[in-house]
């Protein structure tokens, strides 16, 4: 998998997420993979539904991106939450807004090359990186940060996200905020 995975020919929110991906990739060299918006897929295991985050990799294939999915290293991805609001008046640009989350998971040893658990320093570095985002025709802000597994991966089946993947040396965050875009398009 490439370090920065973007959707081909992105529009609307995917295009805006691409700007944030660029800032993350440029400013957080410890991120092995800077991924686009994830899709929530469902599979049945032992008669029960299990929900997982996945990214589309082409040719009708998806790659699961939970911490235990495979050895993908430190990574980030986006979740576009609902509802998406549309503001449109005839003769003007379309404005859309939506809550969103940036999920970041990492092995803290690869960030500082030490056996320390300074999660506040990691949060600071991530906030500094996304603050450097230049976004054409849009803006975003972060309102909340979550650290507990049940909040970071709340849309997904908790059994699949064992808490061991948030114990030393691993940690994760959910940066939740609001994103607004403007687009020239016909409705």
What is each of the regions a protein language model found here?
Residues 1-91:
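Small/polar-rich, solvent-exposed N-terminal microdomains that initiate assembly or binding
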Residues 21, 25, 135, 181:
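Hydrophobic/aromatic-lined pockets within catalytic cores
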Residues 34-50, 114-124, 176-187:
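Short N-terminal helix-initiation segments at or just after the protein's N-terminus
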Residues 42-46, 97-99, 103-105, 110-139:
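Acidic, Ser/Thr- and Gly-enriched intrinsically disordered low-complexity segments
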Residues 60, 66-80, 156-164, 173-187:
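Aromatic/basic-lined ligand-recognition segments
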Residues 92-110, 165-183:
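Oligomerization/assembly interface segments of phage tail-like spikes and tubes
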Residues 119-178:
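Acidic-leaning, charged glycine-interspersed low-complexity segments
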